[in-house]
Amino acid sequence: MLSAESKRKIGNKIWQNESGGTINGLTTWNVGEEFPSLGIGHFIWYPKNFRGPYTESFPSFIRYAQQRGAKDIPAWVLKTPHCPWTSRVSFNADKNGARLTSLRNFLANNIELQTDFILAKSQAALGKILVVATPAQRETIRQNYAKVASTSNGAYALIDYVNFKGEGINPKERYKGEGWGLLQVLANMRPVASGQAAASEFSASAKRRLDLRIKNSDPTRGENRWREGWHNRCDTYARPL
């Protein structure tokens, strides 16, 4: 069970990873993407007529916030099932408009709620992964998860990576048949002892899977531009919180 202080540190690290810990970064539409990324966890929200290969998470967060009794969700969000902006240009043109300003205020005032949502996703991830993993993978994944989780920065790594690149169970999240989620990172770790050694190997395995993703990606997506940032993020997993 994570302490309140550990949760606070993890939430702030995720926010730092995704948008430099800035309030402005809580509503972002990245170059080359077809959707905005919202909140400390850069939760994806798809426009109405777009369905990408990545798991959409912003609507799930809003449902979670409602279940937790959040009273300050902007009314327009509750009435809008799909992202109302259809392009990065229209999104950025409205960056300081009433809707995005109210959304940033809500997100900035509910950092702990977003952290709890990310934690809940992470805690549910292992069970989902074991269901879809091959019988040969299951024990390796279970053991590696326990080894990594035995340190506070390892626990942060497991939580952050699920939020960052997903569980690895969505068959659409593949390039040339190869995934890059938590399943693939855990399954491809090299044999290592529990503790900091496991956290360091998780970091290294994550970088290897992300390098493979870049290698297998459509060159027109230009994913190589993300390599340095992705590696920097994975490097934080090997360092104490």
Report each predicted region and the residues it spans:
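Cell-wall polysaccharide-cleaving catalytic domain and substrate-binding groove, primarily
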Residues: 1-241
